[in-house]
C-alpha cells in the first residue's frame, strides 16, 4: 500500500452499524456501499479533516465522481479485495489523484522542497511510481527518432538527457525490456551496441561522481565530450571506446593458499572488471585542478600507444606472465571461463 493507515482506522470504520449492515447484504452490494459512502461523509473523510483558526472542522471535498467511484469499487471486487478495505482503497486513490495534480504543477520548480514535503507526508512510493512513468514515456519518444540518437539530435541534446535518464535506460537495457504504448504496441527495441555504449558511459559517469556531487561530475562529463567532438567530430564516442579497448587489461593473477604456500595464479579478467579498471586508472591519474583537460590529454596520448596508462597495462600483463608455471592450479579457482 502506498499510504500508511492511521492507528485508529479499524476501530473508526469497522465497528459502525452501517458497515455491518453492508457486509451482511449480498444482492445490493454496490448500491448500498455507495449510499453509505455518500450519506456518511464524515466517516469517509476522516483523513481530510482540518481545524480552522476558530477550532471548527473544515472538510475538504473528494475529487472522485460517482461514476468513477463505482467503477473503482467494481474493479476492486473483481480483483478479489475484501469489502471491508474498500474505504481505505478509495481514500488511497483520491490522495494519489490529488498528489499527481500537485506534482504536475511544481515538478520543475523547487524539486528539493517538493521532495521534502512529499517525504514528510509519506508519499515516497507514489512519487516514485508517478515519476518513473513520465521518464519511460520520454525514453520511448527519445529512442524512436533514430538508431544513434546522439548523431541525429546533436551533442547538447545527448549530454543533457543522458545524465538525467542514464540509470533508467541501463536498467531497461540490462533486463532487455521493450518500450510499449498503452495499446501494447512495440515502439522499439534496444540494440546490443547501444546498450554497451550506454553501460560504458554510465560506468565512467559513476566513477567521476564522489561525495554525491552530481552537478560537478555532469560539468566535467560535458566538457570532456565537447573537447572530443571538437577534435574527432562525428566519431567522438567511438574514440572513447577505442581508448578503453587499448588500455583495458586482459589477464590478471589471483592469490591463493595451496598447502600453506602463496601462489599467484594467472587468469582471464572478466570484461566488466577490465573496463572498470581502465576507467579507474584514467580518473586516478587525472589532475584534480583541471580534470576535463587532463582526461582529454590522457585519452589522446593513449590512442597513440603512449603514456602512463599503457605502462600500467604492460605491468599488469608482465606480472601474470612471470607466474606462467602456476596455470596448473587454475582448477582450484572458481571462474566463469
From Swiss-Prot:
Main subcellular location: mitochondrion
Pfam families associated with the record: Ribosomal_S7
Keyword RNA-binding: yes
GO MF entries: rRNA binding; structural constituent of ribosome
Coiled-coil blocks: none
Keywords annotated in UniProt: Mitochondrion, Ribonucleoprotein, Ribosomal protein, RNA-binding, rRNA-binding
GO process annotations (BP): translation
GO CC, one annotated term: mitochondrion
Location(s), subcellular: Mitochondrion
Keyword Transit peptide belongs to the record: no
SUPFAM superfamilies assigned to the protein according to its UniProt record, in alphabetical order: Ribosomal protein S7
Primary role: One of the primary rRNA binding proteins, it binds directly to 16S-like rRNA where it nucleates assembly of the head domain of the small subunit.
Quaternary structure (record): Part of the small ribosomal subunit.
Family: Belongs to the universal ribosomal protein uS7 family.
Protein name: Small ribosomal subunit protein uS7m
Organism: Acanthamoeba castellanii (Amoeba)
